[in-house]
Amino acid sequence: EAGVRGLEREIAKVCRKVVREIAETHSNITVEVNTEQLEHYLGVKKFRFGLADDEDQVGQVTGLAVTSVGGELLSIEAVVVPGKGVTVKTGSLGDVMQESIQAAITVVRSRAAYLGIDPSFHEKKDLHIHMPEGATPKDGPSAGIGLCTALVSVLTGIPAKAAVAMTGEITLRGQVLPIGGLKEKLLAAHRGGIKTVLIPEENRRDLKDIPCLLYTSDAAD
């Protein structure tokens, strides 16, 4: 389990400080450490978990990712400006992630008329796709559906729902392929206050391995 050794070290640190306080005060009491006291014993929080945005925004979608220490929320941003069809990709993105961006653009272009988007948008506008926390490398294909949604949102002006997270690889035909790390991703969504997560149909079978408290019974029907 990722982080268990670090957790053991932090617990040991709390125990040492409690023992020292008892020894210094010569008291003979039982000490109960609660969450409010953790900052006193361990200092200011070193990490923070991502939280869902409060407002729906155009061109911004909540994705999900898996890191070496568990799942995380992944913010996907898309901005369109007048230009000549240049696509800028930033956020320390790996090769597979960049290929996913290109696939998402092609999917949107192939369905532009159906979606109410100018079919020649790729000739008249520049796209900038960014994933914040640029110091953290990002890779993998599972952001495909989020990228498509962010692109459609920015090109139509329709805000994407901030309280909805999504994950899934997308093909050029618009099919959504299964992903890995579903448990970690759902845990990240749960921590972030997100109650609705869109997952590939083929990952439905993986829900049997997910703690029931993370999803309603409707999700497995």
Regions found by a protein language model. Name each.
Residues 31-46:
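Amphipathic alpha-helical
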Residues 6-20:
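C-terminal helical "lid" of AAA+/P-loop NTPase domains
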Residues 35-39, 63, 76:
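C-terminal accessory/connector segments of nucleic-acid motor ATPases
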Residues 1-4:
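A short helix-loop-helix "switch/interaction" segment in the helical subdomain of ASCE P-loop NTPases
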